Amino acid sequence: KIKWFKTMKSLAKFLAKEQMKKHLGE
């Protein structure tokens, strides 16, 4: 369960980074 939570956390971080890239690109 903890491993899954860790994965979700890193995934959220990755998505946030991608979102930032989109923001800066526009």
Curated annotation (Swiss-Prot):
Residue stretches spanning the membrane: none
Chief place of localization: secreted
GO cellular component, one term: other organism cell membrane
Biological process, per Gene Ontology: defense response to bacterium; killing of cells of another organism; monoatomic ion transport
Role this protein plays: Forms pore that permeabilize the cell membrane. Promotes efflux of calcium from synaptosomes, causes hemolysis, and dissipates voltage gradients across muscle membrane. Potently inhibits the growth of bacteria and yeast. May function both in the prey capture strategy as well as protection from infectious organisms arising from prey ingestion.
GO terms, molecular function: toxin activity
Similarity field: Belongs to the cationic peptide 04 (cupiennin) family. 05 subfamily.
This protein's UniProt keywords: Antibiotic, Antimicrobial, Cytolysis, Hemolysis, Ion transport, Membrane, Neurotoxin, Secreted, Target cell membrane, Target membrane, Toxin, Transmembrane, Transport
The keyword Ribosomal protein is annotated on this UniProt entry: no
Superkingdom: Eukaryota
Name under which the protein is recorded: M-lycotoxin-Ls2a
Tissue specificity note: Expressed by the venom gland.
Subcellular compartments: Secreted; Target cell membrane
